[in-house]
């Protein structure tokens, strides 16, 4: 099938527009006669910058307006960072494709220090995520962790203005915006296990648009899809959202998936880890199996305590 016109819904931040233009380019290469437009939109998540995501409704704030555009036909597809997509999509929507993953790890950015280990007692580190906060507090209890919101450029400006001694950002976002030069170090899995889906782009459509599944199929990357499926299954099984310090990272080798999961308390006092392996065709079951291991170690009680504290 060769579509005549496709409209991509996207947030208007530089990073979101880079992602939309990347998919636009892929679609134009696949379907040279197709007109591919981008519909830029401002979401609630972009507007509320004075509170952490965990306090204002979570990651769904970044996708609701885009889903409305899919629902009412103004757009055919929406491009998201998968880590910003809620684990359960609203009824009537589906992820039609998951693109090949870029760098899944977190980046340490600082004008004063080259490594986290160098930072002295009381140094201020900015992060937008409870997941990062829990892991940083556990490994570096002498550091002061403070909330950081805004787009990539806003966060870098806050660092440059001296509000923070260092900040932690997703490496993929910096690399996509050609800001690699700001990265002092890529954080290891032991320092900061990534969020479910980190580094991967997802393409969402209205579920009834049967015509689009085949059109978007060439954009799907099988290995990334399997890994992200496992990660999201783990997070879904534990009620994962940005209100919970939860990490999930899956790798693949010769058809075998290895999934590592983590749940922590934001103060770093408790960090639970679990892992398991399974063939790629059992990605969803693998996610649920690692979630059960974490639950058996007390993850549900820990998550309940965190949510009670947040609320």
UniProtKB/Swiss-Prot annotation:
One of its GO terms (cellular component) is cytoplasm. It comes from the Bacteria. Binds 1 dipyrromethane group covalently. Its cofactor is dipyrromethane. One of its GO terms (molecular function) is hydroxymethylbilane synthase activity. Its EC number is 2.5.1.61. Monomer. Tetrapolymerization of the monopyrrole PBG into the hydroxymethylbilane pre-uroporphyrinogen in several discrete steps. PANTHER family: PORPHOBILINOGEN DEAMINASE (PTHR11557:SF0). Belongs to the HMBS family. This is Porphobilinogen deaminase. It comes from Neisseria meningitidis serogroup B (strain ATCC BAA-335 / MC58). The gene is hemC.
